[in-house]
Amino acid sequence: MASQLRLHLAATPPLLPHRRPHLARPLCPTLNPIRAPLPPLSRVLSHARPARAVGGGIEPKEGVVAEGDESGGGPVLVGEDSAAFELKDQSVASWAYFAGILGAVLVALNVLWIDPSTGVGTKFLDAVASVSDSHEVVMLLLTIIFAVVHSGMASLRESGEKIVGERVYRVLFAGISLPLAVTTIVYFINHRYDGTQLWQVQGITGIHELLWFSSFISFFFLYPSTFNLLEVAAVDKPKLHMWETGIMRITRHPQMVGQVIWCLAHTLWIGNSVAVAASVGLISHHLFGAWNGDRRLLSRYGEAFEVLKKRTSVMPFAAIIDGRQKLPKDYHKEFFRLPYVAITMLTLGAYFAHPLMQASSYQLPW
């Protein structure tokens, strides 16, 4: 699992009343961290050849204007083109393999963790719940456990991959993180209305639509974690990517921003102490993840990341407003891509499937 924990499970979370019983050749290849200082940026920009991302690599493309050219334009990129997806570069065999792996993982997850008669998920949750009778405390503990495991394994990724390889480490990472994420999500769904009510806004006209729209938008920030699904499933060799286009121009840490938007919207809607506890845990985890992510990218990409960092921002739109980020004239085209279309359709579909998702969650004694 490459993404951070999200209580949406690839869906816009419910805002319903409770019913419960090309781009430039990168200055640093993805797989080869920079070990020597880069030449001055002005020199790089004057000699760099514009390029476009194709699949997992980069190939030259004419006609893209680099900074310093007579016709003007945005700076040559040091990172990768996010959400680049071309059908001609896809392998049917790879996606069939991905589907098979996904099916096997879901079956194993159900048998070994979710099913109370065969899995250990219920015993794990009982052990955590034995610490306190407070749903708020248990909710916070679950997010902390997930955060420690998820961020800890991400931090150890470089060392771990040297020992067991990229694919094996990704399988271990997902195999440990996914059950913990599912447990936290199900517990939140089952107990989100069990806390102390702090405010009530569900009857206010227009609040549902406002918060639903906020949750929907949050997924365009959260999505970069799955730009490379074949790598998530270890079909392709996993890499530590340094994205630079699309949503990354708005904020360098879209997952953190998306999670904050999601948490604020749902905490306002639910309005109780359990929602507050979940949001505190998740936002804290993602704030640490933003710092840790910068640290890992700096370690892997060196000066190239420093260049990217100077022209991006953590706070949404800050780099654009103060002029450090120069949006290309056709910036909107960076969103008119199949991955963004797919996430839009899946998010809408999952939202309308929330009654089924809730019913499945309520069947578990979690």
Curated annotation (Swiss-Prot):
List the catalysed reactions.
9,9',15-tri-cis-zeta-carotene = 9,9'-di-cis-zeta-carotene
Has UniProt tagged this entry with the keyword Amino-acid biosynthesis?
no
Cellular component (GO) terms are: chloroplast membrane
Keyword Lipid metabolism belongs to the record: no
A single GO molecular-function term is:
9,15,9'-tri-cis-zeta-carotene isomerase activity
| Presequence boundaries | 1-45
Subcellular location as annotated: Plastid, Chloroplast membrane
Q: What does this protein do?
A: Isomerase involved in the biosynthesis of carotenoids. Catalyzes the cis- to trans-conversion of the 15-cis-bond in 9,15,9'-tri-cis-zeta-carotene.
Name of this chain's protein: 15-cis-zeta-carotene isomerase, chloroplastic
Organism, scientific name: Zea mays
